[in-house]
Amino acid sequence: MRYGKVKNFAIKLARLPLLVPAALVVTGVRLLGLFGVSVKFSNFFSERIGHLVGNIEIYLCERDLGMHDGIHIWTHYGHISSQQIALMWKRVMRVWPSYFTTLVILINKMFPGWEKNEIGTNTMDRDPKDVLQRCKPHLVFTDDERLRGEATLKELGLGPGDQWVCLMVRDAAYLPTLTYHAYRDCDVDTYADAALMLAERGYHVFRMGKTMAKPFNVKHPRIHDFAMDGTYSDFMGVYLGAYCAFCVSTSTGWDAIPQAFRRPMCYTNFVPFEYIPTWLPNSLVIWKHHLKATLTRVKGKLVDGGWEAYTDSGKGKVQGSFISLEDDELTDQDWKHMSIEEIEDSGAGMFMQEQDFVRAGIKLKDNTPEEILEVVSEMADMIEGKSAPDNQTEFWEKFPRSSSLSEPLHGEIRIRVGAKFLKERYAERKEDSSGSAGARRLEARTA
């Protein structure tokens, strides 16, 4: 702690000589504004690769389409999650050193009207305006970088014309201090069958990630545990995502790389449900199963600070206005699959923290290895031109058009649900004997 304070003081002291130049820049910027020349500043959200790539690619597309005017100057804020991405952005944007630009931004904020000189934090990595399909990718490799990538692929055993699939499975090693996102974690072992299927079809499979909880123990010469075998590099983490045949993911920030290069995506175990990246073409999605506990009676007795509650064959705890359920004391009969309408009505489709699901008495169940294999096989067939997804019109007409912070989450819908997953989810609800309104509505829609 003491070292940190000394370091911060030293940084502030070193910046003192820059105060006058920064103030002169602010003065110049304000004077230019009087003559109709707009100069604006903003920070990259550098610490998260999803925002460093996704937000900025959307911004640059908007700029190309005339949605942003003026001279824009950017700087990094915080630790840079990918030096390769930072280097590539510098080729197409004005990026100033953070130690100086931060002072410019702070001094500018000391005077009225500072908002005119700020781009504002672009926190949207979604594409409801459909800008990605109207613009070319802005991340571009140099000739030397392409040669470097090809040479590395050769070292890894890939020959000319070989295709590969990126596999990105979020686990507990990703942002371990932010446990409220743990509901998004999955077990990479459940992807073994899908990886082997792809390898047998001739694809190389690269398990991606910079820091992962455990190795991907699947033995095949075309399956590479890039995240754990010591071959990972910041550069290849971008290169592989840029040129993959498609990417299989559970939805992480790294996905922004293949998305920015307009690569097809196959999402599995996706949550939150209403945040599905609907704008992606040539892509498929299946989501985690949402299960609702059905409590039939509650005992009016306080137990360890909560009311003891019983289901037909197990028990949980009522704490305040929500139910904390103990999985080891509940059986499968205590859980009921939720329909799309029930997910939407409960608010679970927009839940962003694990505790939200706990409060609502909802448990998320991962996709099975069979479900993952099925949708990845369908994706490979689609990429190879062996099949094409249908429009799924009825489903997408009912899909909730949610908004977040007054911004729409969806525009034109291009992604499709895995065909077998969609069919079986509906069949599952039709066989549900609970008689719920959601089940009846779903049965009517799929009759």
Functional labels for PLM-detected ranges:
Residues 84-89, 213-222, 257-259, 277-279:
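Short loop/helix-cap segments at secondary-structure boundaries that form the rim of catalytic
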Residues 89-96, 202, 243-244, 261:
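Short, well-ordered alpha-helix to beta-strand connector turns
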Residues 44-48, 174-184:
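Short, flexible/disordered intra-domain loops and linkers
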Residues 237-284:
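A donor-sugar binding/catalytic signature common to diverse glycosyltransferases
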Residues 167-175, 188-233, 397:
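Catalytic donor nucleotide-activated moiety binding site of glycosyltransferases and closely related
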Residues 115-152, 282-443:
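Leloir-type glycosyltransferase catalytic cores
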Residues 3, 11-146, 381, 393-431, ...:
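Secretory-pathway glycan-assembly enzymes, especially type II membrane glycosyltransferases
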Residues 79-80, 170-174, 211-214, 253-255, ...:
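Short, solvent-exposed loop/turn segments at secondary-structure junctions
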